[in-house]
Amino acid sequence: MEEKKGEPLFGKVVPLPLVEEIKHSYLDYAMSVIVGRALPDARDGLKPVQRRILYAMMELGLRHNTAYKKSARVVGETMGKYHPHGDSAIYDTMVRMAQDFSMRYPLVDGQGNFGSIDGDPAAAMRYTEARLYEIGELMLADIDQDTVDWGPNFDESLQEPLCLPAMLPNLLINGSSGIAVGMATNIPPHNLVEVVDALCYLIDTEPEQVDIGEILFRMPGPDFPTGGLILGRDGIIDAYRTGRGKITMRGRTHIEEGKRGKTFIVITEIPYMVNKTNLIETIAKNVQDKTIDGVMDLRDESDREGLRIVIEVNRDTDPNLVLRQLYRRTQLQSTFGVINLALIDGYPKELSIEEMLNIFLNHRRSVVRRRTQFRLEKAEARAHIVEGLVKALDIIDEVIALIRGSATTEEAKEGLISKLDFSEAQAQAILEMRLQRLTGLEREKLEAELAQLLSDIERYQTILGNPKVLDSVIKEELLEVKRRFGNERKTEIIDAVEDVSIEDLIPESDIVVVLSRDGYLRRKDLQEYTLQGRGGKGRKGTALQEEDEVALVAVTSTHRDIYLFTSKGRVLALKGYVIPESKTGRGKLINRFVALEEGERVVTMHGRAVDGAKYAFFITLRGTAKRLDLSELENLTRAGRRVMGLDEGDEISQIVLTSGDDHLLIVTAQGQALRTHESEFRPMGRTARGVRGIRLRKNDYVIGCDVVANGRWPLLLSENGFGKRTKYDEFSLRHRGGSGVIVMNLSDRTGLIVGCWSVAEGDEIVAITSRGRMIRLAVSESPVLGRTAMGSIMMRLDEGDTVATASVVSTEDGEDD
């Protein structure tokens, strides 16, 4: 008999295809593991078993200032009420929350043997005891004030919190790790002080103004409980931007000189999650196998004072060479693969650092809002009662007479409501009032309580009605957590050794860096461009795809930073040698080297060293100008930092470095120029928008700005190859905000001005066209003409080609301008 799919057999058995049943069952299992076991909630940073353990400990009254209780009691409470799984899994989770080498900020205070960094297991749960740390109690603070949602436990006999209020950002400060089905999470721990600083920055900053560089400035990277070192910042930047990255960790070591010329390598901190015993065994095996040479002895001198592994080195062996072998062949140097995967509304998602911080802030906003609403309702209810009691005291004789004249309590209650206009709640409170409340002192207490309640109600209403006030409450609580529990960073972040070694291996040479309009970055050796006479056509300098054009060019050296200023008012730093060298190719996309945001592009490149300069002067296309102290550009990385707030549609046109007492010449595309003193522009902070620098005509825009200097000229170059030098003396000093004077006589033949550069007699200029042709010219080839002159042909162009940009090379110091 042929059976139909899904129809019961004999009223009990439903036939289903085996493949379909396995598929659905496995998917159900996978989702159960993902949501209910392996991944943390992005709000409180806890997996379900961790959350249930903490809540069970709170219910047992295991506060930080109470007596310890047996771990078996905690495990039994958790398993019996909320987590019906193996007791060993629950105990192992609680043990980890008590280990100061596993958690940056342990939540559970364990007494007894809770394991060691050597990999020793914890004692059985019947021997150990536990209670909550004070910082662990913050995870549960205000849970009794309707701050979070609740759900039924496994047998629907009790309610359990679906998320804890979490006054501290646990996901970031303690991290998380877990393997689900088809996905895994591995979030590193961070320093509480730095995380709170980053959260406060987000609270104080408008969302559209938030900058990943500012977050990195306050929160430079993970802080592991075992200390050690982090090599390089690239992995951190990748993890913060995308949710994935690879961080290189290294143990902390130093070299000691002993008696009789002995030398020792001493390891005092090891990478996070590295087993000390396994590390020692690995070192010993490598020494035995002769893959690590020069080691005479190895011993573990760790005690209660701290970790100490001593490696005695042969007298004729360089200890630094042995150290490099240890980094290469043992876990003394390890990697931490960051996967910031957490649950949001029950769905797993990889999160950037900004998303993780915002999720916590939004959670705290919800918690504080619900807590305030709870307190408001409670205060209003109590104020209503106290108002009734005060009113009753005002007419106490009538109240007493009514009560004495009533046959029953219900009759008295009805009389108070109907005759004296009390509410039911007030009437009940009056009937329950003791006679001692009739004294004058008690009346004063009631009036004081009412005044305090009304003040509290007003404050609660302000918090609920004003998001800024709500955020200020959150910020105040975070700063208090930071004050009470913050401590110094344990893990030091240093520059990657590979960066130093690469720079040592690469000879320093002057290079031309080219960025195309499609975002391709490349470099060539400056010596490849031979000096040509005025009117030369140049040589092919860069291979570009059809319709791609050169956007920017700068001269720097392989060892120097090149500063990239973006359309969104940020500056990023990149070493010259990092840029790929190519004689004819397009290069590599700039996004492979620097962290550009969506829709952001580089508008200015500056390769000149900043030695001796004090300020950076910015001018935008629309003529807005700003002066910034150069100290604001220290410690730049490819993550970048915001240096100027911009109006919508505006971009940075030029940046020059100044001494603090310089004259500036601002030039526009339509041939206007304004000379002004930099003191007209007071120094501003990184996010300030600046002030008007020059007044522009219709459709005009700023193309350049230079520092006026003795023995130098402004060199102007038009899009059709015309150029000239003009004396600075022809431009009188004026106040900022003016429209300036004519600087070049323009026509259809010359085209608009593409740039203005300050040059000296011995300088050279490297110009590049929109089709990628380059020419290197001596500045002396450019004539010195009046400011109203048209100039002469500096570069002959093919039909349809135009000058894109240029860079000036100083023959004295090799620096660009």
Swiss-Prot record:
Name of one Pfam family that matches: DNA_gyraseA_C
Limits of the Topo IIA-type catalytic domain: 39-505
GO MF annotations, alphabetized: ATP binding; DNA binding; DNA negative supercoiling activity
UniProt keyword Cytoplasm, yes or no: yes
Motif segment (GyrA-box): 532-538
Subcellular location: Cytoplasm
Assigned EC number: 5.6.2.2
Coiled coil: none
Record keyword Cytoplasm present: yes
Annotated Gene Ontology cellular component terms: chromosome; cytoplasm; DNA topoisomerase type II (double strand cut, ATP-hydrolyzing) complex
Single biological process term from Gene Ontology: DNA-templated DNA replication
Principal location class: cytoplasm
Keyword tags: ATP-binding, Cytoplasm, DNA-binding, Isomerase, Nucleotide-binding, Topoisomerase
Active site (UniProt): Y127 (o-(5'-phospho-dna)-tyrosine intermediate)
Family: Belongs to the type II topoisomerase GyrA/ParC subunit family.
Other comments on record: Few gyrases are as efficient as E.coli at forming negative supercoils. Not all organisms have 2 type II topoisomerases; in organisms with a single type II topoisomerase this enzyme also has to decatenate newly replicated chromosomes.
The name this protein goes by in its record: DNA gyrase subunit A
Gene field: gyrA
